[in-house]
């Protein structure tokens, strides 16, 4: 990948971008180029960082950028925003929730394995209130085929993490 990053790394603008980012630690906006160039610039500028967050205007652009980003970083993922249109949320609710949980799972795995990850989302995806990652970690339940499960303990654990018990 250095073949793709080296020409950009020598540009004064990229060097200034890296320096500004290291000094301030603040988010950086890249504009004035097409989306595929933005992905190339992002990966060249922040290649040394393990966690990268790219925020874009709409879902279609975010998904397209995620596909482009996979060329530079195989662990690039798209974090979908919560669907605020109730009809659409009802139809796609489980699919979106599943995608978001898979994304959180990959972030936790990257953090545990000390690997790089690039998360691409929309501004609406940033509005979503999430629990801290440690709370997700603390509430992961593992089962083996040979386990004997105490249903009352399992029920109390599930209720404790937010599930609702309903009569069958």
PLM segments and residue spans:
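ASCE RecA-like P-loop NTPase motor cores
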Residues: 1-168
């Amino acid at each position: 990948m250095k073949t793709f990053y080296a020409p950009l790394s020598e540009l004064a603008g990229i060097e200034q971008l890296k320096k500004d980012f290291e000094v301030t630690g603040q988010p950086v906006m890249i504009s004035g180029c097409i989306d595929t160039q933005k992905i190339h610039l992002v990966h060249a500028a922040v290649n040394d960082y393990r966690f990268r967050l790219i925020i874009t205007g709409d879902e279609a652009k975010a998904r397209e950028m995620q596909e482009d980003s996979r060329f530079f970083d195989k662990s690039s993922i798209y974090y979908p925003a919560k669907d605020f249109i109730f009809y659409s949320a009802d139809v796609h609710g489980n699919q979106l929730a599943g995608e978001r949980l898979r994304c959180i799972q990959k972030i936790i795995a990257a953090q545990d394995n000390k690997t790089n990850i690039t998360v691409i989302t929309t501004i609406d995806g940033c509005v979503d209130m999430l629990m801290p990652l440690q709370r997700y970690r603390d509430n992961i339940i593992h089962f083996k085929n040979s386990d004997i499960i105490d249903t009352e303990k399992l029920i109390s654990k599930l209720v404790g993490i937010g599930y609702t018990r309903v009569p069958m």
